[in-house]
Amino acid sequence: MKNYQAEIVAVGTELLLGQIANTNAQWLSEKLATYGINMYNHTVVGDNLERVEQAFQLAQSRSNIIIVTGGLGPTADDLTREGFQQMTGLPLVEDKESMEKIEGFFQNRGRTMTPNNRKQARVFEGSTVLNNKAGMAPGMYVHYQSCHWFFLPGVPREMKHISQEELFPFLEKVTGKQRIIQSVVLKFIGIGESTLEHTLSDLIEKQTNPTIAPLAQDQAVVIRLTARGETKQEAEAMLEQTKKLILARVGEHYFGENEESIEDIVVQQLQDLGYSISAAESITGGMFSQRLVSVTGASNVFAGSFITYQSRIKEEVLEVPSEIIHSQGVVSRACSDAMASNVTRKIQTNLGISFTGIAGPDEQEGKPVGTVYISIADGDEVVVSKQFNFTGNRNHIRDRACLKGFELIYQYLKSKS
C-alpha cells in the first residue's frame, strides 16, 4: 500500500492579511482524514507569481497529493494557473464546456461578459476538468511527475461542492484503498492541561496507534485520539479501548466529546432530571444566560434570569437583605448565597445560580480584582457556595467565572443522577 503524503496550498493575499480565515484547509483536512490520507503540510501564499511558483515547487518536492485552493478567478491577481505553468511548462487551453457555461451565465442575466472572464475556462492541456456546478471556474486534476495535483476554487461553497462531487471520488480511484483514520475529541473541565498530561504521561509516551494529543481550548481541556485501521469498525474499537484507559484515571473531569459544549451537557442533564434553572448575574452581566440559551432546547429548562449589576438592584429586585450588603458587601459569600436562593424563589425554579465579583480594573470593598463568588441553590437550600480568585483582564475574569458556573452545575447535577 503506497504511503500518500498530502499538502494543501492556499493561494490568496487576503489569507495572509487575516482578512478571511483559511476554513478551506480545516474542512479539507478533516474530510481527507476519513479517507486515510495523511495531511502533512498547509501552505498559504500571497498573490505573487514568483512566490506561488516557489510554494508549488516546495509542495512538489515533499508531497504526492497536492490540493491547491484559490487563484482560479478572472482577475490579474488570480495567479494559480500561471504559477503552475511557470513551474511545469504545461500549456493552457480553453475548455469549451466551461466557456459555454460562463457565456451562458452572463447571457441569462442580460449582462455583457468582460474578456477577462475567459481566463476562468482555461485548463491545463491533458488535465481532467472537475465540474463546478456551484460557480464558474472549473477545478482541475493534473498528474505531474508522480504527484497528483488538484486545483479548486477558493470560494468555500464552490470548493466543498467540487470536493464532494468530484475530488473525493476521484481520490478514491487514484489512491485505492487506504487505512481508515478515525478520531474522537474527549473534553474535560476542572483540570489543567499540564495536570491532565502528567496524569496520562505513560499512556502518551507509549502511544503508537491510537495517538493521544492533549490540547488546550478556551472552554475546555481536550484530548484528541486518532486511530488507523483497516476498517472503520477496527479504528473505532481501538479508540474505545484507549478512551476507557483514559477515563479510568480522569473520568471525573470528563463531560463530552467532539462538538459537545459544557452548556450542551448541562441542558441535557437538566432535561434528564426534569429540573429547571434560573440565574442571578452581576459580574457576568448575562453571559451565563446567553450561553445557556444558545443551546437548542434550553427553553425547556431555563426559566429566566436577573442581571443585578448595581447594589440597589440586588436589594430592590432580588431582595438581598440590606444588612448583608452594608456589613459584608455585594462581593461576598452571603450576598452570593442570597442571590441564588432568592432567584430560585422568585422565578420558581428547582435550581438557581448566582455570580458576583470584581472584574476590575480596580479593587472593591477591600477585595482584589478577580474575586468571584458563585452559589447554587436547590429549592430552599444553598448546595454550592464557592469563592474563586481569577487572574487576567476584565473579560477573561468574566469568562472564567461563567465557565466555572457551568462546571459547578455540571458536577452538582452529575451527583444527582
From Swiss-Prot:
InterPro entries: CinA, CinA-like_C, CinA_C, CinA_KH, Competence-induced_CinA, MoaB/Mog-like_dom_sf, MoaB/Mog_dom. It comes from the Bacteria. Disulfide bonds: none annotated. CDD domains: cinA (cd00885). NCBIfam families: cinA_nterm, molyb_syn, PncC_domain, PRK00549.1. Belongs to the CinA family. This is Putative competence-damage inducible protein. It comes from Oceanobacillus iheyensis (strain DSM 14371 / CIP 107618 / JCM 11309 / KCTC 3954 / HTE831). The gene is cinA.
